[in-house]
Structure formats: C-alpha cells, structure tokens
Amino acid sequence: DLVRSRGLGDVYKRQIQLYSVRDILNKVDNKNGKCDPTYTALLKKLANMGYTGVEAANYNNGKFYDRTPQQFKKDVESAGLKVLSSHCTRQLSKEELASGDYSKSLEWWDQCIADHKAAGMKYIVAPWMDVPKTLKDLETYCAYYNEIGKRCKQQGLSFGYHNHAHEFQKVEDKVMYDYMLEHTNPEYVFFQMDLYWVVRGQNSPVDYFNKYPGRFQIFHVKDHREIGQSGMVGFDAIFKNAKTAGVNYLVAEIEGYSVPVEESVEVSLDYLLNAPFVKSSYAK
C-alpha cells in the first residue's frame, strides 16, 4: 500500500536489528549447511512488512546465525533485504588493559573484519563494553577502538560503538560517553546512538547532537516496547535534529513486546513509516 511503499525504493531506508526477532531465530536450526524454512520465511516476512535491511547480532566463530558470511548474505538478499551492519565485539582482558598491548585482540578483529566484508556489511558496531575502573583503562579502550576503526576503513567498512545507559556514568571525574566521543577519531569511529538508552540514562539525544555534531551515523530507534508507544522518548524533537546528528541510517530494535513478536516489529515499522517527522530516507 501507499504507506508501506515509503519504505521501499532506497535499499537502506529501514533496517531491523535481528535481535528483535531473537525468540524466533533461537528456535531455528541452520547448522550443517541446511537452511531452516522458518529462517527463510522470517526474513521474507520482514521484507514484506517494509523493512529493507538487517543488522545482525549473532557473529560467532566466523559465522552469522550458523551460516558462513557468504551464505548469510545470500539468504538475506534472496529474501529481498540488504545486509547493512552487525553487532559484535571483543572486550579487552585485564592483562591487555594493564599492558596496553592488545595485539592478540586485533588479530581476532582482522578475521572478524574479513568475515563482515565477505557478508557484504557496511558497518561493524561494538554493542557493549563494561565501565572501566580507571580513566587510563578508558583511554586504552579509545585507542583500541581507533585502531579497529582504522583497520575497518582500510577494508571499506566503518566501525562504531552502540550505547546503553551505563556509559553515562562517570569514570573518575569524566562522563564515560563524553570521554569516548572526545577521545576517538571521527575518521575511524562513529557512534550508533540508541535513543531509548540515552533517555533512560537521563540525557537528551538532541543535546548530544549539538555537542558532538556529525558523530551519530546510525540511530538505534527503540522504545520501552513497540516504537512510539511509551511516549517517553521524544522522537519528534530527535528526528527534527537528525541532520545535526549526522545520521545516515535508522535501525529499529524492539527488545520488549506487548503483542506477539511479529506483530510488534510490524507495528514499530508502521510508526516510523507514518510519523510525519521521520524522513523516508537518510542515506546520502
């Protein structure tokens, strides 16, 4: 219909984080090279709803949802979707933080980057890190992320960090999130702002756009349950300031549900497609 057609055309207009449908995916058996029909059907359902791309959340031992990078790309594209991005990370050990030598972890990242490139990814996003005990450890993490981002860029990908609420705590006397924004190189590290978690952390996304313009290439559009239902996230003001943020892509993520999962992700997309303040595309 006309409303849904706004989500089509540009191949990267509306992404969904596959963690949103984890309860379905977790029941799917993709092992031994056999593609469970439930998995294929789910991807096609998402495409039929009006989603145009996916963000993975299951990279492990060189595979995505037990599929090789090439097979995952093929499965997604066969369903009429595109592969945009993926959540994965490798946290530094106590020994690496103490020594400042994270070369072993960088070896892991080299393989990780190669696998994501083979899967057709544009972005790799680190979805989590613990709150460091010292500012020195946080500084080491920023240097680590800069190096990962540099290696991603050399392979034609971009590297970013996704927040929750704990990044708004202070490490010594510095707000962790602000310190990360100020000590990572914009050339190598972008930030995937999770709008809901910024609000839950008692902060204003728009204030961050104005303080650090252009750093937030992807929005994780999330709410307490279905997108737009709680009224606690000021989506109107957020999207009116999206240009300042520097956003290129929107990724819907639904972590909690008040209706069945498939209905929940569809209702959430409908909100984004119908909201007058959400542009049909942010891709440049």
Feature locations, PLM:
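Catalytic domains of carbohydrate-active enzymes, especially glycoside hydrolases
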Residues: 36-59, 116-122
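Histidine-centered active-site/metal-ligand motif
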Residues: 1, 87, 162-164, 186, ...
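Histidine-acidic metal/acid-base catalytic patches
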Residues: 10-32, 36-50, 172-193, 197-284
